């Protein structure tokens, strides 16, 4: 379970996908572990222990967002990643910051429902199986004889065996299922998400309880009936209470692009709204109560992780109150040639493995030689230095350019083996990488 993972185990999991940035990984791992530690503390003191929010500072493409993505998969907790630039000050047209907590609540309810459904899945499958057998072999009318019941029982066992073995999967049956409301989306004005959600939930309940007959194949019917039966076994009210508790105690919010809402004294214009977003974030990060359709949610123990490149601004450009709410500062390093080489070879789903898998579908064997990978890393680093530093994302453009012709003519090279060595890389990329004007527009 993720909550019992030690910080070193969390870091080793992140190492599979992100190269370097040990400071950021350690900070995130400790913050995640502290959620578990807090749960072990006795109650009066537990309420006083609040999470220490993290601010990650570093150039674009070095792993800030990737750490958040991998953390979301790793943390068995309600997690939401949002861009700070999406929000506006209350009173302006746009989304206000309270929607962060509402979205987190939606995520938690979905997560809790999936978890509860898994617990009752075995019972739901049995009930769905019985309902399918009732359709395949309608039960006989009661006419006072015992013998037909025995025959029916034997027939049910035969059909049950066939059903479990998948022999009846393609048989078409007519089934009575719960009628869902026709898909209807309500487009509300910006900033009125709560009202729109209330109207949507009001209309959602209109079609409940109604049933209609549908023709479908047995395997489709089984999936539908399992969902329906599991829904009956799950207590919705209890589910909502669990979800709210999960958000309040374990919720994690990743605020990306926080540097884009800083106020810079030398720039005028839309600074009022930007500062307003920072002021609106203050109570949310410090701890407040937000109204959602599932109930009131306290944000006191939600962990906030913010990140930004801070190329045009500094962390000190944030309003002082917000700076104080992010006590842990972590600086991420720019990527070196060795880092680029490691990204191409050591990560679990590296670009080289992805392209090899894609070419394999055309029966083309792609082999990356060590000197070829080193040359790719050098070119990516060089272009970043000369033009604009976009971090690891530069590898996407370099790799696409390198394999452009091969990808286009792959169907003609079926059964061949293509080796990507330093000479191959130079023949495709040297001219582009050497010319600053060309690399500016092409790479």
From Swiss-Prot:
One of the protein's GO biological processes: protein unfolding
GO CC aspect terms: HslUV protease complex
Tagged with keyword Membrane: no
One Pfam family linked to the record: AAA_2
Subcellular location(s) per record: Cytoplasm
A single GO molecular function term of this UniProt record: ATP binding
HAMAP family registered for this protein in UniProt: HslU
Function (record text): ATPase subunit of a proteasome-like degradation complex; this subunit has chaperone activity. The binding of ATP and its subsequent hydrolysis by HslU are essential for unfolding of protein substrates subsequently hydrolyzed by HslV. HslU recognizes the N-terminal part of its protein substrates and unfolds these before they are guided to HslV for hydrolysis.
Subunit structure: A double ring-shaped homohexamer of HslV is capped on each side by a ring-shaped HslU homohexamer. The assembly of the HslU/HslV complex is dependent on binding of ATP.
Family: Belongs to the ClpX chaperone family. HslU subfamily.
Record's protein name: ATP-dependent protease ATPase subunit HslU
